[in-house]
A protein has these predicted regions:
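Juxtamembrane helix-loop junctions of ABC transporter transmembrane domains
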Residues: 14-18, 41-42, 49-62, 83-130, ...
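Alpha-helical transmembrane segments of multi-pass membrane proteins
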Residues: 35-36, 83-102, 153-160, 181-208, ...
Length: 606
């Protein structure tokens, strides 16, 4: 299934994901729960102190300045200073803990996502494109980090300030305080309208980001092909089209979200005008006498509270906008975290593989439940431990699909597959895969020294064991020619070694596992025939008890096998030794003759 097809499945499962969104993401807090709790506490302290300041200021004006009392000025001045300093300290600590909580949450979230991906089966991985997973690990996590930091700080501060400031303003003037309440439904209606319209746009943006990352990943992996075919301009144009799509969607979202600020400012200006007008009328009516009505100090406090309430509303609108953006990211991250691997350990797994025998019993296999036709159809096969089995067949005959079932990279759809006389689904996955070494078609080396790469097969391998494995894989010769020998640094993807050298290093890495089953999936295609023969001879002489399955395009690579399978369209159409198949299988004979061309016919066909 392609990366884009995950969108349909995601849409169908969104209601369930939304119900468990907070619960799923909350598991990633762990050791950062403490700063996540401390942040709101210090925010509340900061907010309450800031709200006390206008009341203290009103007393300072009315009792100190208007009343011409120096002791009152000193008293309320010191209280004002103490409130300001304590508020500053609380704000600093709130910011510090919010940063720790946000960054820690993001770190754990990335780790949890990556760990989840590592536990995926190939079926799970096929649902997501590389670019999609990269976006979810980077852009989406960053969006959630920013939103979380804002929620635990501004999301707590704003409502506290709004509620407490309104209570204080109500104590001063109930009629004027109602002005603030009138703004709330206007803002709520406007913000909800923006959210409903913009959320689908941001979802579309992040899916487009997936495509952009796919283009970059594909281009960098195939950069040599791009340059050899001078297709740079084509790739630039393709990248530009997707980038333009992101630009258009973001511009559309920004245009809509830009109404947020004007709406907020209209509420601010209208509120200030009404407060000033109503306050001035009451001051004039009372003659600035606190006993008769509003005073100048009270009006100053009301204006300050008005600004605090409206600033709190602006904070809430910022948090709201960030939540709209991050909701799409949260849903995409939860798609990964809630994805259940299709290949899991049984309740009481078997911890030992007896031998390298393999038995396919009426095995059918589909990559997807939606597939009309099975990839493998009614496979019946018995391989004794220690046998060498060759597999040949045309492109698309499901040779690789067959062998990928042995280490449970995929599970069979129907039937059963046994290794060592036990169904593979009963084994502990790690134990099974440690005993089945597989060299895939695409040979991958990682950044690091040759020795580091080889120790992927056995982290505790000694230098002697590494060299012995390389000798069997015919890799020791060219390694010794490097100036740094086994300490030679391999560039990312193994770009500084040839295809044949890369294949031999991967074979050596597999041999270091000392497996009971060794699978070579067309893993000597870049090796010359002489070296290929030396590798097979080394296998025959040095690891006779290991079951060896060799997929190859060259008949020469498999003709000495104990049994050769001929596959076509997911079925085993013939099996036998090289000589038997030459006599009985037209397809095998055709492949052999096309490769030997003008060579004389074998003795057995005369």
């Amino acid at each position: 299934m392609s990366g884009t097809n995950v969108t349909t499945a995601a849409v169908q499962s969104q209601p369930k994901q939304k119900r468990h969104l907070v619960r799923t993401l909350g598991k990633s807090l762990r050791e950062y729960r403490k700063p996540s709790i401390l942040t709101p506490i210090f925010v509340v302290v900061e907010g309450v102190l800031e709200i006390l300041i206008p009341t203290v200021m009103a007393s300072l004006i009315d009792e100190g300045i208007t009343g011409k009392s120096m002791p009152a000025i000193v008293k309320f001045g010191l209280i004002l200073l103490a409130c300001s300093l304590c508020s500053l300290a609380a704000g600093f600590l709130a910011g510090k803990f919010a940063a720790i909580a946000g960054a820690g949450f993001a770190k754990n979230l990335r780790h949890d996502e990556f760990e989840k991906v590592q536990g995926f089966s190939f079926t799970n991985i096929d649902k997501f494109s590389t670019g999609s997973i990269i976006t979810r690990l980077t852009t989406d996590v960053t969006n959630l980090q920013n939103a979380y930091s804002m929620i635990i700080r501004l999301g707590v501060r704003a409502p506290i300030m709004m509620i407490v400031a309104w209570i204080f303003s109500f104590r001063i003037s109930p009629s004027i305080s109602l002005v603030f309440l009138a703004c709330i439904p206007v803002l709520a209606f406007g913000l909800c309208g923006l959210a409903v319209y913009v959320h689908p746009v941001f979802e579309r943006v992040f899916h487009t980001y997936d495509k952009l990352n796919n283009v970059v990943d594909e281009n960098l992996q195939g950069i040599r092909v791009v340059k050899s075919y001078t297709r740079e301009s084509h790739e630039i144009a393709k990248f530009g089209r997707i980038s333009q799509r992101i630009y258009k969607d973001f511009s559309k979202a920004d245009r809509v979200m830009s109404f947020n600020n004007p709406l907020m400012m209209v509420c601010v200006y209208v509120s200030m005008i009404l407060i000033a007008w109503m306050g001035a009328k009451q001051i004039v009516a009372s003659g600035n006498n606190a006993a008769l009505g509003l005073t100048t100090g009270d009006l100053t406090a009301l204006v300050t509270y008005a600004m605090q309430i409206l600033m709190a509303m602006m904070m809430l609108s910022m948090v709201f906008v960030m939540c709209i953006i991050s909701q799409a990211s949260a849903e995409r991250i939860c798609q990964v975290l809630n994805e259940e691997s299709t290949v899991t350990n049984p309740a009481n797994p078997i911890k030992e593989v007896a031998d390298g025998s393999i038995e396919f019993d009426n095995v059918d296999f589909r990559y997807s439940d939606n597939s009309e036709k099975p990839v493998l159809d009614n496979i019946n096969l018995k391989i004794r431990s220690g046998m060498t089995v060759g597999i040949v067949g045309g492109t698309g005959s499901a040779k690789s699909s067959l062998v990928q079932l042995v280490p449970r990279l995929y599970d069979v759809t129907d039937g059963s597959l046994k290794v060592g006389g036990v169904d593979v689904r009963k084994y502990d996955l790690e134990i099974l895969r440690d005993q089945v070494a597989m060299v895939l078609q695409k040979n991958v080396l990682f950044s690091g020294t040759i020795a580091d790469n080889l120790r992927w097969g056995n982290p505790n391998a000694t230098d002697e064991e590494i060299r012995r494995a390389c000798q069997l894989a015919q890799a020791d010769g060219f390694i010794q020619e490097f100036p740094d020998k086994y300490d030679t640094y391999i560039e990312q993807g193994g770009t500084n070694v040839s295809g044949g050298q890369r294949q031999r290093l991967c074979i050596a890495r597999a041999l270091l596992k000392k497996p009971k089953i060794l699978i070579l999936d067309d893993s000597t295609s870049a090796v010359d025939t002489k070296t290929d023969k030396l590798i097979r001879e080394a296998f025959h002489n040095e690891i006779p008890d290991t079951t060896k399955i060799i997929i190859a395009q060259r008949i020469a690579s498999v003709q000495e096998s104990d049994m050769i399978l001929v596959m076509e369209e997911g079925r085993i159409t013939a099996s036998g030794t090289h000589e038997e198949l030459l006599r009985t299988c037209d397809e095998y004979r055709s492949i052999y003759e096309s490769q030997t061309k003008n060579q004389a016919q074998p003795e057995e066909l005369k």
